């Protein structure tokens, strides 16, 4: 966005009061191109969506290479509004985030590739925990799942052992699903989303305490294999429990709009993890595919 520098400063205490929006929290969407330009010491070009509508569309797509190709084509034609040094931009963002504590960053290319949704995602909830496809509301499509709904739960990692994970994850999935299906949201589009996808998000907390109980300091590489083992059992338990819900509720109506039939998290994780974690998967993931 050509106004990104002004947008970043809108919450700053140094900004004039008449322009400040202290009560509004929002996120900034980036993709790999920004980081690559910063690494290489190059500028980023700022385009208006009016002059580059196709670029804006590709920004939310699932193929960043197509975005970069169009981006560089428009750059070669000098169609950008202005340019800013990529490193200066990231420094400015980091400074404003540090001072205001209310900016959230969304890596939109990662959001659209490391996801189970087949439709493109353009936004998330404010704290970037839950990313779903959304559409502009239309009164003529009252039953269209246009509003993403967060149905979130949490497991205290330091209080649950690997042996307890199957029972705990099963309980969490069943409880959150039941709660979701009992909810009645103000709009039919939100209800259509919840009932169509039956999506829930289960996270973890207290990882630092879990690490301390093992006798390590947070961030030490020695704990990574143990963490990987715990997280594999955590993910496996959640997906296994979700499969069992089919016996109760049947297949989710919008299951066909996801890639769960062919793709597991194990298939799409960032392979750079293999350079810091030597452990290999130990559970029967193929059984879940069936």
Language-model features: locations:
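Short coil/turn segments at secondary-structure boundaries
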Residues: 2, 19-25, 46-52, 104-111, ...
């Amino acid at each position: 966005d050509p106004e990104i520098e002004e947008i970043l400063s809108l919450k700053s205490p140094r900004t004039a009061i008449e322009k400040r929006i202290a009560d509004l929290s929002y996120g900034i969407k980036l993709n790999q191109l920004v980081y690559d330009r910063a690494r290489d010491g190059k500028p980023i070009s700022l385009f208006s969506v009016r002059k580059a509508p196709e670029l804006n569309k590709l920004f939310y797509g699932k193929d960043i290479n197509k975005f970069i190709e169009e981006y560089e084509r428009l750059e070669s034609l000098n169609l950008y509004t202005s340019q800013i040094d990529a490193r200066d931009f990231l420094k400015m963002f980091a400074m404003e985030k540090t001072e205001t504590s209310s900016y959230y960053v969304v890596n939109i290319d990662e959001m659209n590739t490391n996801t189970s949704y087949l439709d493109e995602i353009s936004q998330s909830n404010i704290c970037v925990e839950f990313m779903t496809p959304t559409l502009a509301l239309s009164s003529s499509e009252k039953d269209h799942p246009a509003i993403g709904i967060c149905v979130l739960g949490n497991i205290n990692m330091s209080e649950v052992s690997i042996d307890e994970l199957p029972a705990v994850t099963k309980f969490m999935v069943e409880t959150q699903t039941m709660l979701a299906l009992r909810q009645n949201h103000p709009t039919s589009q939100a209800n259509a989303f919840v009932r169509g996808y039956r999506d829930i998000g289960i996270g973890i907390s207290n990882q630092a305490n879990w690490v301390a109980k093992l006798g390590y300091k947070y961030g030490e590489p020695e704990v990574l294999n143990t963490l990987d083992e715990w997280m594999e059992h955590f993910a496996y338990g959640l997906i296994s429990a979700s499969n069992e819900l089919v016996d109760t509720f049947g297949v989710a109506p919008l299951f066909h709009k996801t890639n769960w039939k062919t793709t597991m998290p194990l298939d799409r994780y960032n392979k750079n993890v293999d350079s810091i974690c030597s452990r290999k998967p130990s559970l029967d993931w193929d059984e879940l595919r069936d």
